[in-house]
Curated annotation (Swiss-Prot):
Signal peptide: none annotated. Core subunit of the mitochondrial membrane respiratory chain NADH dehydrogenase (Complex I) which catalyzes electron transfer from NADH through the respiratory chain, using ubiquinone as an electron acceptor. Essential for the catalytic activity of complex I. Belongs to the complex I subunit 3 family. It holds the Pfam family Oxidored_q4. GO terms for biological process: mitochondrial electron transport, NADH to ubiquinone. One of its GO terms (molecular function) is NADH dehydrogenase (ubiquinone) activity. This is NADH-ubiquinone oxidoreductase chain 3. One of its GO terms (cellular component) is mitochondrial inner membrane. Core subunit of respiratory chain NADH dehydrogenase (Complex I) which is composed of 45 different subunits. Interacts with TMEM186. Interacts with TMEM242.
Amino acid sequence: MNMLTALSVNIALSTCLIAIAFWLPQLNLYTEKANPYECGFDPMSSARLPFSMKFFLVAITFLLFDLEIALLLPLPWAIQTNNINTMMLTAFILVSVLALGLAYEWMQKGLEWTE
């Protein structure tokens, strides 16, 4: 019963705060806030510069591989098994998936900058 009360109070408080933030916004529009900030100076060009699509693809690939490595590192503690063969098999499967993903990116020329 105590947990139900705490849950209902949390939900009611969250709903109340969201409603207040939705219905009472700040309506003061300042021109300084609408402009991009560039070290205190007026911006020389547009704040939305074009970027290389190759860089974007390499950055996304890096983030995906980095996430997979972050999931691989705590694997021995997450499995909580004393059987070293099971742990090594699971780690080998994850490393194999990483290697296959890297090989696929390499074959699709996703890591090439010169093209």
